[in-house]
Amino acid sequence: MGSILSRRIAGVEDIDIQANSAYRYPPKSGNYFASHFFMGGEKFDTPHPEGYLFGENMDLNFLGSRPVQFPYVTPAPHEPVKTLRSLVNIRKDSLRLVRYKEDADSPTEDGEKPRVLYSLEFTFDADARVAITIYCQAVEELVNGVAVYSCKNPSLQSETVHYKRGVSQQFSLPSFKIDFSEWKDDELNFDLDRGVFPVVIQAVVDEGDVVEVTGHAHVLLAAFEKHVDGSFSVKPLKQKQIVDRVSYLLQEIYGIENKNNQETKPSDDENSDNSSECVVCLSDLRDTLILPCRHLCLCTSCADTLRYQANNCPICRLPFRALLQIRAVRKKPGALSPISFSPVLAQSVDHDEHSSSDSIPPGYEPISLLEALNGLRAVSPAIPSAPLYEEITYSGISDGLSQASCPLAGLDRIMESGLQKGKTQSKSPDSTLRSPSFPIHEEDEEKLSEDSDAPLPPSGVELVLRESSSPESFGTEEGDEPSLKQGSRVPSIDDVLQDGSPQHHGCSQPVPPADIYLPALGPESCSVGIEE
């Protein structure tokens, strides 16, 4: 990796390696890596010349056995790294074996059990038309930068199936079945010496003569496992992405995943790590990857501290060789779309203060990895956003012309004050309980003060809902009388609904202010419902 880049920077692009030699680790002679590597457009020296930064050294054997020339020009020091576009992806977690039994009518020898056959199924995503082929017991050869697989027996290769572009497409080919009774035990696993893969799933982009996507492919390498009961299962080994005739080995990052369905699925383990905060400070968002264990568990500040205090990963305790910060950026939008309030997204704004903006290209802004993975949560027009203050909206009492919504503010505070009898209550409305969507003007302040000075009938702690011709002059009050008098009649809910029904008011005349008193029976039995 580093040696190829260093040779290119020195101006030597031709690689003098014999055609019959192969790249295998450990090499028979020489070194696989140089004493430095390039990452993010910068050069770094490594104290471990033969150390692979992104995994185990044996993972290198899954790459191509022949070196290829790097097709890109070396970027400038301050130029952003080019992002490779993946047009097709096979979800390796969805790969499974489907078991088939031969029909009872099929001819079998006396005493012989019917054969058990298997086929492969999986889910994939494609941004272009693809052609998928399955190879069993196959070897890989690179021809002009394109991976070509060949089987020792033509019956071990499936037919090529063509698919259109789409997401979450299901691959199923019952016509291609695998008979493991004809396989040896050593053929179920990857043979490093011979370079034979038990199964290869190749998805090649099939867009005709489009030059931009020529040579794009996705390869899934897998092996088989035999269980005690005689059944078999498939185990994914590695994934490779071939872009512009260069093979890239895909490695997993532990600590970041798609969490669109995280809230809908209950967690089986309460102690499972489903958060996106740094495991050290538990406040900032994690954005730093530890290499070679690939644990994304640190924020920028804690990663800088860890460089000088320890050299072990806080998750697996293995020594690390490098720290890689992953920063997601997006183009600055012209007009911001409304998004619902999210503490995680709001926290990312504070997190940006810890990171420098020198490496951000002009015209872009940093966003959290959670935003980059799942996108912004757009507010649905049918579902309003959650209230930012103690505001509950009830629809019901109409002013005769239009249906007005009445905010019920400070409900929890009213119930708490109902338990403390005999305390003096302020008659002026609390400004902290006003809804931001209902501004109160000076004339409304005077009207509210006059309404608050009016004597209240004897009752317990009462919740007063005032209706007026304008929804802006709406307030809440609490009575401070100690208790109900004996023999006094508590208004029923039918009386409340009858007094508040719009049929008693004329549509041509303004509606005078009316008071509705609902007795509060305590926090355990307080239930308010007003509906037209």
From Swiss-Prot:
Modified residues (Phosphoserine): 428, 449, 452, 501
SMART domains documented for this protein: RING (SM00184)
SUPFAM superfamilies: RING/U-box (SSF57850)
Biased composition (Acidic residues): 442-453
InterPro entries assigned to the protein according to its UniProt record, in alphabetical order: MGRN1/RNF157-like, Znf_RING, Znf_RING/FYVE/PHD
PTM per Swiss-Prot/TrEMBL: Autoubiquitinated in vitro.
Biased composition, class Polar residues, residue ranges: 422-435
Localization: Early endosome
GO biological process, one term: negative regulation of adenylate cyclase-activating G protein-coupled receptor signaling pathway
Keywords: Cell membrane, Cytoplasm, Endosome, Lipoprotein, Membrane, Metal-binding, Myristate, Nucleus, Phosphoprotein, Transferase, Ubl conjugation, Ubl conjugation pathway, Zinc, Zinc-finger
One GO cellular component term noted in the UniProt record for this chain: nucleus
PROSITE patterns in the record: ZF_RING_2
Motif Required for TSG101-binding per UniProt: ranges: 384-387
Lipidation, N-myristoyl glycine type: 2
Tissue: Widely expressed, with highest levels in brain, heart, kidney and liver. In the CNS, especially prominent in the Purkinje cells of the cerebellum. In the skin, expressed in the basal layer of the epidermis and hair follicles, primarily in the outer root sheath. Isoforms 1, 3, 4 and 5 are equally expressed in the liver. Isoforms 1, 3 and 4 are most abundant in brain, kidney and heart, respectively.
Gene3D superfamilies hit by this protein: Zinc/RING finger domain, C3HC4 (zinc finger)
Region annotation (Disordered) ranges: 419-518
Enzyme kind, highest EC tier: transferase
Segments forming RING-type zinc fingers: 277-316
Pathway: Protein modification; protein ubiquitination
EC code(s) of this entry: 2.3.2.27
Protein name: E3 ubiquitin-protein ligase MGRN1
